[in-house]
Amino acid sequence: MKLNISYPINGTQKCIEIDDEHRVRVFYDKRIGQEVDGESVGDEFKGYVFKIAGGNDKQGFPMKQGVLLPTRVKLLLAKGHSCYRPRRNGERKRKSVRGAIVGPDLAVLALIITKKGEQEIEGITNDTVPKRLGPKRANNIRKFFGLTKEDDVRDYVIRREVTKGDKSYTKAPKIQRLVTPQRLQRKRQQKSLKIKNAQAQREAAAEYAQLLAKRLSERKAEKAEVRKRRASSLKA
């Protein structure tokens, strides 16, 4: 079985193949989300704690969280479900998925290091893979740098260097949800426009109601006149 071990703190991951079945037997009958002591896998993982994140069986079918079986099942999957990506709006499909309980039929098991042990694992804990892009949303930039609402977020945007031919220049993402004076002015303008439109609609509705009442009274008067004429002709 292969163990795909990831360390989110450093942004690294590595696939380690373990031929001895006795070493991976500790994972059997465990579910996705459960934690396992690393020392039972091998002495090189002493002090480590692994969390089971998923895996694939020998035919390539992925494990699905919530399916409490150690076998493969066919489920009707739709948009929002894991292990399925719909191609059309509202499309559903019955697909084979592997249950969330670990068994000997798995080819790859995905693990996350939740607690670091004594020794370094080559290529995982001793390396770091920096993030290529920084945060883009204004609140996330504030959270990333520990800024207050008074600080200007635009000074803290992470720029990246781009080289095109002989020239090199820096590039920064457009900050999303940034509150600027122009945005506040636009918001005020939209609000005043909304109030003006609502007032115009109210006035138009009142004018229409007045006209309708006038037409109804005119029709009523006409009918009364017709009745009066009819009554006078019958008397004559």
Curated annotation (Swiss-Prot):
Record key words, sorted: Phosphoprotein, Ribonucleoprotein, Ribosomal protein
Molecular function as annotated in GO: structural constituent of ribosome
Modified residues (Phosphoserine): S232, S233
Cited PROSITE patterns: RIBOSOMAL_S6E
Modifications the protein undergoes after translation, according to the UniProt entry: Phosphorylated.
InterPro entries, A to Z: Ribosomal_eS6, Ribosomal_eS6-like, Ribosomal_eS6_CS
Keyword Phosphoprotein belongs to the record: yes
Recorded superkingdom: Eukaryota
A biological process from GO: translation
One CC-aspect GO term: ribosome
Protein family (similarity comment): Belongs to the eukaryotic ribosomal protein eS6 family.
UniProt-recorded name of the protein: Small ribosomal subunit protein eS6
Species of origin: Kluyveromyces lactis (strain ATCC 8585 / CBS 2359 / DSM 70799 / NBRC 1267 / NRRL Y-1140 / WM37)
